[in-house]
Amino acid sequence: RAREILENADLILAEDTRRAAQLCRLCGIQGRRFLSFYDHNEAERQEEVLRLLREGRDLALISDAGTPLLADPGYRLVRACRKEGLPVSPVPGPSAPAAALSAAGIAPLPHTFLGFLPRDTAGREALLTAYAQVPGSLIFFERKDRLKESLATAARILGPRDLAVCRELTKTHEEFILNRLENSMDLSDELLGEITVIIGPPEVTERTPREEVESLLRAELARGGKARDVARRVQSAV
């Protein structure tokens, strides 16, 4: 389906037009028109793209790797399309969070995808603190040069948990490194490629049986409210 859409699109919006052109060549697709569309020009290009869609043109949006909008460009455009009633259709493709969850052996549900962690230490600390008591696994992307620093911050804030460092997913050098968050400093400094991190859910203390916590969690979820508030109520109860 993806190939058919790329073959028939009037214009392909691409995070990197060179990589998009290479993809089309590998798929035997010729004569396509491309428009550069990425985080730093999305706002200025949006009206031009919307005009083409209003005229009935068929446009395709692709990212360098993974799925558009999931830590990739496209959110503002898709939101604008929905507000105007312009049709948007997803095309199944590679997604690092889904691939990592399917093979890491860490509880997949519930989970929260955080995208890329903030670059600054204070920002990372604030984000991880906000999600520290949210039930379920946490998933995020991180650069190789910030990985160990981010994991050290996570270990300090989140406490003992399961950890999976997944790199180069679905590629030739795919690797899953399973460890404990508190032991993350044991990781090699030589990890290369695109890295997806999964941190397992908060661990239940011996003082509170898992069944009791799960029962309390179900009751609090039934009460409603934001996930953060539910987590705080459960934490205070146990």
Question: How would you describe each model-predicted region?
Answer:
Residues 18-20, 66-67, 96, 146, ...:
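Alpha-helix capping/helix-boundary segments
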Residues 41, 65-73, 119, 147:
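Acidic, metal-coordinating catalytic cores used for nucleic-acid/nucleotide bond scission
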Residues 1-39:
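Glycine-rich, flexible N-terminal cofactor/catalytic loop recognition
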Residues 46-95, 99:
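Glycine/small-residue-rich loop that forms an oxyanion/phosphate-binding "nest" at active or ligand-binding sites
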Residues 6-12, 85-89, 137-138:
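Short active-site oxyanion
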Residues 35-44, 117-121:
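Conserved helicase motor
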Residues 57-58, 137, 144-238:
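A contiguous loop/helix-start segment that scaffolds small-molecule binding in enzyme catalytic cores
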Residues 76-134:
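Class I SAM-dependent methyltransferase SAM-binding "motif I" and its flanking Rossmann-like core
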